[in-house]
């Protein structure tokens, strides 16, 4: 018998009628199922025993043969073979159809494969199949074409005229005949020739048709097989019929559908035998077509076949589709035996690798092990009595239970399992009660809390499974978060509070200033209460006297030997940093021991501190009232300005929001200072927030500051701020406003959780086959990673960005010019810091985006495995990890919105350009005009370039200068010397920079900082000027985009008319006139304002500042365009944004990008509601490029402006597809990674870039063929880029011309459906469509990914399941005994060793497993012996 693991691939094809008959064990002729009296299957019916096999094991239908010894005998009386009843799950039957019927998948799906082959539309096919029109099969000399449709009258006329030569048909027969006459080879050749002759054919249908023809040619399928003569009947056990109480039957819907087919087929046979009139026969044939269609795919039809209770029947297709379908319900998700679930409670006494297992559960879960053990120890004579003993819960059962459970790891899982840390292994410790005990530090990984959460427990049974659980899944091996390499096991809540208390310092506490010689003395002093835990004392530590506190001394005792003495107050963030540091320096074993000790100390001292919160602890800042009054005055002032018409209503609104945001921040500061002073810095509310144990600044602000601004349900901010806090109590109106946000939070949570889950599912689907498959793909390509800045603030340092990557080039020390880090060095945290110290701000590294591995990815491109901080191993399923890392925070974030209770966080708008250090203004670029106040104003977009002033000297004070103007200096380089009183001092550079020598002034300047400046910005500095830190370089209007007059003159309106496209409003409050440009659909107006010779195009929503004929001066604002009102930014905006990016959707108002470098020419042309601009290239060889921009959109460029390729020409969001087409793949990579990261960064979530890169790489795997050359591709065909390269190499070797293609970006869903594996695609979405396509192409699934292997029940090809590990032969003895004793004296040592083994390699593990296979019996005997020895002890 073949082993189920022995096949390498699965092919899907169309079945020919002969093949269907080969499968079949007999024809089903009757629609009957079972006899209602005898309850036995009817002969020749849908459950017939003769066809499908016997219902009782080893017994025929009539009972003549009743025993296994007649195996294989066919009964001469009833014709049933004596066999196992299991064959009823595999034997098929068939129905011979009286007339051919078209398969619904091939004619109804879009695009219709049948239609493409015959060059007919679905409606034309339908009219032939449903007997409305005839189709010409052989036109003879009639002048008509084959495949044309004619009606009945025409048909008879042609028959009379041309006799038997003219052939036309109707119904399935005709379609079958047409398909059979297609010569696939010849047709494909003709179309290819056509495409080459015409070169550019826009009709996509031709390419589609060629694709289908070639699919049939290459797969060996015949087109006429899409029309069925024989329908297969699936085995009866797969469409069962069960008796319910009360004598009724429940049956699968398929039986009803089959019965309809058989009934209609039999009726048709009778009608044909009786030579019934054509009209009746045709009607019956049409009904048969309907019935077979409904059987295969009922949901595809407009009028579905309904069963009892008007419910649509589930057809064969419906059984595969959707969440409840075969793929997702039964093949990808199965129920697990030996599992249980219970409520969890906290187990502070547990070690990190332990969980508390209730005895009741253990008894049930380990039943077979206990039974075997009872029999082995002769406490029970046989298995049956052992079982009875367990059920009676005898005393000796519990003794045995202890030994059975002892070294047997179990898996704990909490739903939803959003990332791999949602399932971890622990060693069980038996506990009383019914609740599972969980270690408090693993809660974060599971996202568990103890408010009624439940967890599931699973028992690994096989020795191999136990070994793998032990070496890979035990909790000490899962200390780090795979998303970012940070510890996920950090202490929270009570523990943090205890550690904060323990390590803090109090002034003037008892015993302050005392000296001690060591820890023992200090502990004695604490016991005798001569010194307090938080007093400042001096202690002799490692030969030095240090100032510290007893608490810190105690804390440092639990730190590993050799770790630096920690002498500061620790909050949650600091503690986490220490854990990360210890992990990197000492490994997981020591870290785990330390974690347990920190947990012990934390709980102990939180108990000693024993904080409680009362209403008096919530201190309101005394300055609050004054600050609120000031704010009210400022708001009034803004109202005043608005009434006078100085600012618009929108500007006023934004100003008010900004005033309240600032006031709220000031009140918060004051309140925190107040709390800090209270109770010597130990106000419980303050301590909880400051230590990071619970609560945040945001929440305490609402308790003791002011609640601040709230958001409407729409997300807009209500300008009426809530001035009260919860301590004072809210007014009625304030309370009412508050309720919006609170509800929105809860509603969002419910809706978004589902969205985040769906995002994760799509991410997993696209990246599940990315597995580390080789060590190095050898690519020369790489990416450049640099510091991430927002303005001038560094958000992500270089060391953080390049952590865990391989360098792609040699890194040289700029001073000594020696290679410090050669190419292909793995960058650890320490190395990253060194690279940063060398003065690099960007370096080239290897990246998943540029990996050339055909299947999966290589170690060098992927870099470090973030969960273990070692290079990723071959077999690591990095795609799935990437998907989980991106998807998991999505769900988290959506759940986190409601904690703030809807308080809006408005971002304060900057009004000035400034830099946070002294700097030199290098140059000011742009068109500047002088306004009425004498200030210089930018009339077009420009830039200000500044350099940081690092050092400044007067050369006269220096004795020697060794550098010249413009020279580059590295950090620490000597560039001058100065004679001091006695010796010569050498002067070195503080930072890398460039030398500027002007006269006697020597400056060292940082790199150019380019500040983009918008129109209307007022300049506050000059070229060559030194500007102090945080002083304004320029000032702008943050709320509006403006247009500035470049000359003085008279306003002339062109295509602007009040009442048509200009709305004239009078503001009711201020009586000012507002002129707003509105959209005008009917007339093609191109609104412009002309001043002198300059024209300014006016977009929709612009507010005109002057009327027609008004005089303007140079630098006046002609019109303003209000920028969109700020909505609050939270992941509610963020999750859809991530979704949009990964699905590569084109944004609604995408901006237009310049396709080449050149000058703008604007002739004012209008074509089809669009303005036409031209870009004139520099070189005369290039042609000018035409750009169409919708009327009403704000254009960013004007006549004569110079643009670069990829520059934005109008307002709007970037379209990723445009970026790919114009700027290329690397710009797109950068755009997608940075945009996704921005959303997560806003929420404070850290995800390593490489995870996003893995997904983006999978989105860019396809190429669209633009010119097929001599390859087998078709134009417009989408092919895998590796396949594209392989085919091109083949053609070039044969001397042909290769194909040309452009990379194409596919969204998650599209890319998943286009994977090479049809199994993976079919189980994702659009199951029938995928299978239809795969069957026609005769696709073979090579089972390379994880998903397809799970579906067919193979081991997944990752980790220890990789093919290369399956055939390992081992020739040496078993290495020692694997029974480890964790509860012995050397417990901690053992645990350290166990955890040190954390980065156990998959290869090692597989060897162990293989060795175990070799000698499993021996191992069991050995284990038994060792158990006996235990008993002797």
Swiss-Prot record:
Pfam families the UniProt entry points to: RNA_pol_Rpb1_1, RNA_pol_Rpb1_2, RNA_pol_Rpb1_3, RNA_pol_Rpb1_4, RNA_pol_Rpb1_5
UniProt entry keywords in alphabetical sequence: DNA-directed RNA polymerase, Magnesium, Metal-binding, Nucleotidyltransferase, Transcription, Transferase, Zinc
Enzyme class (EC, first level): transferase
Gene3D superfamilies reported for this sequence: 1.10.132.30, 1.10.150.390, 1.10.1790.20, 1.10.40.90, 2.40.40.20, 2.40.50.100, RNA polymerase II, clamp domain (4.10.860.120), RNA polymerase Rpb1, domain 3 (1.10.274.100)
Gene Ontology biological process terms, A to Z: DNA-templated transcription
Enzyme Commission no: 2.7.7.6
Catalytic activity: RNA(n) + a ribonucleoside 5'-triphosphate = RNA(n+1) + diphosphate
Cofactor(s), names only, from the UniProt record: Mg(2+); Zn(2+)
Chain spans, region Disordered: 1383-1433
Chain sites annotated for binding Zn(2+) 1: 60, 62, 75, 78
Residues reported in the UniProt entry to bind Zn(2+) 2: 777, 851, 858, 861
Entry's Gene Ontology molecular function annotations: DNA binding; DNA-directed RNA polymerase activity; magnesium ion binding; zinc ion binding
Cofactor binding note of this UniProt entry: Binds 1 Mg(2+) ion per subunit. Binds 2 Zn(2+) ions per subunit.
UniProt feature, compositional bias: Acidic residues: 1383-1393, 1411-1433
Any one annotated GO CC term: DNA-directed RNA polymerase complex
Annotated binding of Mg(2+), by residue: 449, 451, 453
Family statement drawn from the similarity comment of this UniProt entry: Belongs to the RNA polymerase beta' chain family.
Primary role: DNA-dependent RNA polymerase catalyzes the transcription of DNA into RNA using the four ribonucleoside triphosphates as substrates.
Self-association and partners: The RNAP catalytic core consists of 2 alpha, 1 beta, 1 beta' and 1 omega subunit. When a sigma factor is associated with the core the holoenzyme is formed, which can initiate transcription.
Record's protein name: DNA-directed RNA polymerase subunit beta'
Originating organism: Leptospira biflexa serovar Patoc (strain Patoc 1 / ATCC 23582 / Paris)
